[in-house]
Amino acid sequence: MSVASQSLNSSSAGSALVELVDVVKVYATAAGEFTALKGINMQVGRGEFVGVIGKSGAGKSTLLNMITGVDHLTSGEVVVNSNGSPVSIHKMSEDQIALWRGHNLGVVYQSFQLLPMLTLVENITLPMDLCGRFNPKQSRERALELLRLVEIEDQADKLPAHISGGQQQRVAIARALANDPPILVADEPTGSLDSVTSEHIFEVFEHLVSELGKTIIMVTHDQSLAPRFTRALRIADGELVHSEQSEEGMR
């Protein structure tokens, strides 16, 4: 059995929340075509904390971009079954993808990407207001609840510049949860943080999976995190080369 088939079968087909089928991504460069993803097949089940581990340039971020729909795939398919109705992401228009993503997917970046002119609580209410899921009073109450979840509620009315990098990442996680999406994707969320802060952030993700039932797909270059995920996938040169189940991450 190939590595791609192993990773595809490691979650049962009936419970797959996210499925990638023969996903290929080719970029046109001055030096010619560059294939960033080479026929990726994988499934992610509900409630999994999946780590995609690889070196810089291995294709980790490109893989996340295919799942979130922020970039076009060259061939293949990405299917997400978040509410009982499977959606083929790349068959939707960009406007449809943006609306779908707002309700179904939370994204956490390494660089936080908080809006500097808005307070922390306003950064979290903004995606709620854009999706129209809550009225203004409900939005603020929910934002404060999410800040409480990531243990930074007392900083709610500060601007991002007035808190630390680790605190900003906590706010970014709260913002990703704003519309209560079933799926979070995280692109090197601890990459710019010190080891102690990184551990705190990772514990937040573990809590979201174990206590709130979220499904998380996280890419990282940090090999030492592999045992902490429920499943770790290794990516190199645009291909999945290894898949391993973790006893520690499953506890």
Question: What are these language model-derived features?
Answer:
Residues 1-26, 242-251:
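ABC-family P-loop ATPase nucleotide-binding domain
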Residues 15-235:
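ABC family nucleotide-binding domain
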